[in-house]
């Protein structure tokens, strides 16, 4: 397969992934499409064509698996403790983790004497 065919395929994957990720949000969908189009028309000169294609495929994969949009449900809808209610756009391709990495991070923080990431105190994670 030629480089131009692979690039076109990656671009199409990106557009499909954006359509899934931003379903119902025309503003974000149009912004994502514009950004992808700009990247195809004026590619980063520091990257090879193969790297650019790989980057577009990675972006498409990230949009499909890791991006979940939330939409606030009516202003008057709240939980019993007064918090707002949101509806999440979780679809068949959304990657649902098991939170083991979050649990491991808390253990690591304790092992480091409570020092948070980036040298912070970790106070935000204690709440």
Curated annotation (Swiss-Prot):
Targeting signal (transit peptide) range = 1-15
GO biological process, alphabetically ordered: mitochondrial respiratory chain complex III assembly
Taxonomically, which superkingdom?
Eukaryota
InterPro entries, from UniProt? Complex1_LYR_LYRM7, MZM1/LYRM7
**Keywords annotated in UniProt:** Chaperone, Mitochondrion, Transit peptide
GO terms of molecular function: protein folding chaperone
Cellular localisation: Mitochondrion matrix
Q: Name one GO cellular component term.
A: mitochondrial matrix
Q: How does it assemble?
A: Interacts with RIP1.
Put simply, this protein is called: Mitochondrial zinc maintenance protein 1, mitochondrial
Give the source species.
Vanderwaltozyma polyspora (strain ATCC 22028 / DSM 70294 / BCRC 21397 / CBS 2163 / NBRC 10782 / NRRL Y-8283 / UCD 57-17)
What gene is it encoded by?
MZM1
């Amino acid at each position: 397969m030629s480089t131009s065919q692979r690039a076109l395929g990656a671009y199409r994957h990106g557009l499909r992934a954006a359509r899934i990720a931003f379903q119902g949000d025309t503003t974000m969908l149009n912004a994502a499409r514009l950004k992808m189009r700009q990247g195809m028309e004026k590619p980063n000169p520091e990257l090879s064509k193969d790297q650019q294609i790989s980057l577009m495929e990675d972006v498409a994969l990230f949009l499909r698996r890791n991006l979940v949009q939330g939409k606030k449900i009516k202003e008057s809808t709240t939980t019993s403790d007064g918090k707002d209610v949101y509806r999440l756009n979780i679809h068949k391709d959304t990657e649902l983790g098991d939170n083991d990495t979050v649990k491991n991070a808390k253990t690591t923080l304790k092992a480091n004497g409570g020092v948070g990431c980036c040298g912070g105190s970790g106070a935000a994670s204690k709440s």
